[in-house]
UniProtKB/Swiss-Prot annotation:
Coiled coil: none
Species this protein is from: Geobacillus thermodenitrificans (strain NG80-2)
Family (UniProt): Belongs to the 2H phosphoesterase superfamily. YjcG family.
Renumbered ranges of motif HXTX 2: 115-118
Active-site residues, Swiss-Prot/TrEMBL: 34, 115
Protein name: Putative phosphoesterase GTNG_0743
Keyword tags: Hydrolase
Listed GO MF terms: hydrolase activity, acting on ester bonds
Signal peptide range in chain numbering: none
InterPro entries xrefs: 2H_phosphoesterase_YjcG-like, Cyclic_Pdiesterase, YjcG
Amino acid sequence: MKYGIVLFPSKCIQDFANSYRKRYDSHYALIPPHITLKYPFEANEGQLKEMTKELHRIAAETPPIPIKVTKFSSFYPTSNIIYLKVEQNDVLKHLHEQLHSGLFAGKPEFAFVPHITIGRDLPGAEYADVYSQVKLQHVHFEETIDRFHLLYQLENGSWTVYDTFVVGGKETV
């Protein structure tokens, strides 16, 4: 089964992202707006128990995660993905590193660029038009996230939460 690890921003940021995603993101119906910490990976039931134990340990050692969303950006020319840029910080960077070492060892497929995708799979002309409009908009959100999530992929391609890990040693509410 496929799993992934993400942060979900507040409803305010999700609503803002979804106002674009519903028009420009082919994955709009498959997963809410999120910040990917670990891209999809395969695991079996036995590995899953060990992983959740390790994720609880990582969460207990991780402070609340400050998030600052500052602008629209793009991965062009690598891909036509348009996203909300999330500023890198020490907490995010350390959490990402922990999710790619030890039990989760493995070189990440991509360099860690924290972001919330708002557009993907756009044809060249549409991508250029949309990006030229959004890149001029002022964007500023700041918040602190107190949990990350282990997701799994359903047969229809959508993602759902398998477990939630509250950071800072708090219990899941």
